[in-house]
Amino acid sequence: MVIMSEFSADPAGQGQGQQKPLRVGFYDIERTLGKGNFAVVKLARHRVTKTQVAIKIIDKTRLDSSNLEKIYREVQLMKLLNHPHIIKLYQVMETKDMLYIVTEFAKNGEMFDYLTSNGHLSENEARKKFWQILSAVEYCHDHHIVHRDLKTENLLLDGNMDIKLADFGFGNFYKSGEPLSTWCGSPPYAAPEVFEGKEYEGPQLDIWSLGVVLYVLVCGSLPFDGPNLPTLRQRVLEGRFRIPFFMSQDCESLIRRMLVVDPARRITIAQIRQHRWMRAEPCLPGPACPAFSAHSYTSNLGDYDEQALGIMQTLGVDRQRTVESLQNSSYNHFAAIYYLLLERLKEYRNAQCARPGPARQPRPRSSDLSGLEVPQEGLSTDPFRPALLCPQPQTLVQSVLQAEMDCELQSSLQWPLFFPVDASCSGVFRPRPVSPSSLLDTAISEEARQGPGLEEEQDTQESLPSSTGRRHTLAEVSTRLSPLTAPCIVVSPSTTASPAEGTSSDSCLTFSASKSPAGLSGTPATQGLLGACSPVRLASPFLGSQSATPVLQAQGGLGGAVLLPVSFQEGRRASDTSLTQGLKAFRQQLRKTTRTKGFLGLNKIKGLARQVCQAPASRASRGGLSPFHAPAQSPGLHGGAAGSREGWSLLEEVLEQQRLLQLQHHPAAAPGCSQAPQPAPAPFVIAPCDGPGAAPLPSTLLTSGLPLLPPPLLQTGASPVASAAQLLDTHLHIGTGPTALPAVPPPRLARLAPGCEPLGLLQGDCEMEDLMPCSLGTFVLVQ
């Protein structure tokens, strides 16, 4: 039975107003570590051993049967695991409506938070940490347990900055030769077979995630990113990622062998241990003194630490009931005290080993400490004492650990959520200052791993022409909807967009356009007119929309940066010596917004080619022509849903196919069409027209919902475009004559005369340049 006492003030009249701490069983709650939808994690201190623990308090009434089963399976797995680099389970308490899981507390927080604050690790330190991670994962696999959610958020750091693997919520048992079919995990760390919905072997899934983790440790960024889940899925399936200039050849080789798309060709843990990069420091770093053996924590082997049992008996805890609890894997108060005392003894012995001196004193025994007394505060009045403690005199024996376990609760209440790194550890990691130079991206070549012999092909394989300039982490992808072009460099200013809201990972995502300065396409005719102060980025061939999910919330690029055009030839690596002048530095520091969350059903994420076009969005909102947004109920130019991503995703695919096929459309001037007089060259402007005195709409619009044009109009020079549209099951209609507008008028847009120079077009119209080289008298209808 769990008794949970709330904060209560002293009775009226005493005037002190003091509050008793919140208690759960033998634990005093100190503060909140984290909150979720159905659970809260509290930092607590055991009242007997004075050890800090983490208590996960779960409201079972708010969980469905599947999630409750997941919680019970996590507890079952943690009961079977005992490893120095895996979070230990101390106690499980359950009532009708609540579940309390008491685990080890890692005082230095998540590895993710450390990387966001300090930048990436040096390869030597990353190797030490990766050895610890690898040993923990190998231990799980040896016990036929697969984790399935390995990521830096689940790698905790204890007081010695050692790794502690946590969160077995997606973990499960597996058997060799029996594939699993639960497609779960965190998208940036998930293997390709999870996105494809294929059955998989558990260890191969964890090895892919280990490759992503090692990349993040060394580079400080994610190898696979994207503004939304479909884009991320596409990049994971392609298996392409960037290699920074500072990564060694051996480290690159190991990462590439782990991040192989084909699970059958993926490296194994035994091969990882024998890899040249790992053998640079072959021995797993450990304490100078021998640590406790695994059977000290195992409940059913019958071999327990006699010193811990002796201390418990000295404190008045029934030895027989403690042994029974350990044998039955009860994980009750008796077992919790034993495990916590075992941890304190381990810390004490390691401290004795590290203490300098020619002669070390023997370990203290409880029988040698009969002159000490145990404070009885909190024990005599505890409701568990009759069942937990044996009849003892008022003066009990206290071990030498009791003096170390006593500490003030007031100081612990003022500690931050994640403890700062000790000054003695300042030289362990490579500090990364948070400066604008460290927040820039690098246009680094991407490579596709094809065929066997990855290590042999590294020096000879030339990278494909890169058509993307994406940022290196999920939160660093520019959210501007860049125009879709063939592989070429597009020079445009950086933009920033705000995250969209209210979307799901499985649907096409809405976006909110941002103001964007004018930009020019990277054609030879226009590149000569560009100033040398324009920042350089590559146009992305993927969806330019952003995601509102916590996993993939994007942030805009840094604006205002003035760099010279890129003047280097991209090869196998970005740079092996020094950065070229004007080349933006590789991001070596994660951002808080890249924190990932685990998902079930990753196989349901649809690819880019399967997105359904409902209605195209406006060119104004996509290209940042103006901050104008159409009303939600307005049809016409914006279709049924303003700002819809689905329409533009398909339109961009059509335009990409048109560019790649090098289709040219030169409409012949219709005899009945009168040409408007050519005014002086001026920028092309589209703006909303309101009021009764507005000019009539022009006859040429990019719109949706218009009736299909008759076949004769499609036979006047539009056959190449029509054939390209048929390949995509899309009706692309081109005409030069005036067309009647639908009954419900679309949002009214005014434009200047159609004879404007194409160089004045804003960035959102770059991809339309090939369709209107002569005039703007041609409209394109996508239905």
Curated annotation (Swiss-Prot):
Residues 583-612 are annotated as: RK-rich region. The active site is at D149. It is found in: Cytoplasm; Nucleus. InterPro entries: Kinase-like_dom_sf, Prot_kinase_dom, Protein_kinase_ATP_BS, Ser/Thr_kinase_AS, Ser/Thr_kinase_SIK1/2, SIK, UBA. ATP binds at L33, G34, K35, G36, N37, F38, A39, V40, V41, K56. It holds the Pfam family UBA_SIK3. One of its GO terms (molecular function) is protein serine/threonine kinase activity. It catalyses: L-seryl-[protein] + ATP = O-phospho-L-seryl-[protein] + ADP + H(+); L-threonyl-[protein] + ATP = O-phospho-L-threonyl-[protein] + ADP + H(+). The modification Phosphoserine is found at S186, S575. Its cofactor is Mg(2+). Activated by phosphorylation on Thr-182. Also activated by phosphorylation on Thr-322 in response to increases in intracellular sodium in parallel with elevations in intracellular calcium through the reversible sodium/calcium exchanger. Inhibited by phosphorylation at Thr-473 and Ser-575, probably by PKA, which triggers interaction with 14-3-3 proteins. Changing S209A: Decreased kinase activity without affecting much autophosphorylation status. Its EC number is 2.7.11.1. Residues 353-377, 449-477, 619-643 are annotated as: Disordered. Residues 27-278 form the Protein kinase domain. Serine/threonine-protein kinase involved in various processes such as cell cycle regulation, gluconeogenesis and lipogenesis regulation, muscle growth and differentiation and tumor suppression. Phosphorylates HDAC4, HDAC5, PPME1, SREBF1, CRTC1/TORC1. Inhibits CREB activity by phosphorylating and inhibiting activity of TORCs, the CREB-specific coactivators, like CRTC2/TORC2 and CRTC3/TORC3 in response to cAMP signaling. This is Serine/threonine-protein kinase SIK1. The lineage of its organism: Eukaryota, Metazoa, Chordata, Craniata, Vertebrata.
